[in-house]
């Protein structure tokens, strides 16, 4: 969703993310063209960067000393959510993302005041309320409801488009077979660890035994990116959204890139987003906005934190 390609990676383990897409990410294109953007996250940016710099092992050790009695799995779970944010997926791009990080609390304030930047990404806490198993999905729904509510009733509502979506299907069955897709590039699926010399992998095997087994199994799968995955929900929230609009057009996550590129006349990152369908057809920009007056939405089953 940020680069239009997986750049051949078949996992997101830290030692693989030192790679970087040849054409960069949408954040690189926005920055080079002077277009403001912010990645909002549930953790204060200073703490977030410290966590990423220390790495999981060092941070866990520090937490064990400072908070005796806490269980190791609980710490790992917390740090997983605390360290993950969209703009920092590739560590090589972390330095350029630093000044674009803000807290979720700041997003609510900016949305209320109508001072959101031209482009924003709002991340959940991937450890506690991203609706992933085994989380309480009501927390994720409550977070999404809170984000939508602040956009709906914020001073910038008349000029805002929010796309609420998910990065994966979550394990639910889909009766529709995924169709073929345009390959983003010519980079085949591979794992950087499996490309290491055999002697190095043998040396590190005691430390990475489970990961190496998992990667070996994954590496036996498809190596091309020429097919979509299972469908995921996507909701358009805008004054100009077409009421009750349904479409059979095939979209994917790079459709968001396509929309951003259309708005600011930016070049495509890969063949995939160049061929993507833009979700503009879900908007009616010619007439009066159907939702100029924000609708009242039902409250979520679980009120927004603290939990």
Residue ranges and their predicted role:
Residues 1-307:
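N-terminal pro-sequences and low-complexity stem/linker regions of secreted or lumenal proteins
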């Amino acid at each position: 969703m940020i680069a239009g390609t997986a750049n051949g990676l078949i996992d997101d383990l830290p030692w693989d993310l030192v790679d970087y897409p040849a054409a960069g990410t949408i954040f690189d294109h926005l920055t080079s063209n002077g277009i403001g953007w912010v990645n909002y996250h549930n953790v204060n940016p200073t703490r977030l960067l410290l966590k990423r710099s220390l790495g999981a092992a060092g941070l866990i050790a520090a937490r064990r000393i400072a908070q005796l009695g806490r269980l190791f799995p609980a710490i790992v779970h917390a740090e997983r959510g605390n360290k993950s944010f969209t703009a920092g997926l590739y560590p090589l791009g972390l330095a350029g993302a630093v000044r674009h990080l803000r807290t979720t609390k700041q997003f609510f304030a900016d949305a209320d005041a109508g001072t959101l930047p031209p482009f924003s990404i709002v991340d959940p806490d991937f450890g506690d309320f991203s609706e992933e198993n085994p989380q309480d999905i009501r927390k994720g729904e409550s977070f999404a409801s809170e984000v939508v509510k602040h956009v709906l009733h914020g001073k910038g509502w008349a000029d805002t488009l929010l796309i609420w979506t998910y990065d994966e299907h979550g394990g639910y069955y889909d009766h529709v077979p995924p169709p073929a897709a345009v390959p983003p590039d010519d980079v085949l699926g591979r794992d950087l660890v499996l490309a290491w010399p055999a002697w190095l992998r043998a040396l590190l095997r005691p430390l990475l035994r489970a990961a190496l087994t998992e990667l070996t199994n994954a590496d036996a799968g498809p190596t091309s990116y020429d097919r979509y995955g299972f469908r995921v929900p996507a909701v358009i929230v805008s004054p100009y959204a077409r009421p009750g609009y349904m479409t059979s057009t095939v979209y994917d996550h790079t459709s968001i890139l396509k929309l951003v590129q259309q708005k600011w006349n930016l070049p495509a990152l890969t063949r995939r987003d160049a061929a993507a369908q833009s979700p503009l057809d879900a908007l009616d920009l010619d007439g009066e906005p159907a939702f100029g007056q924000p609708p009242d939405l039902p409250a979520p089953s679980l009120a927004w934190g603290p939990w």
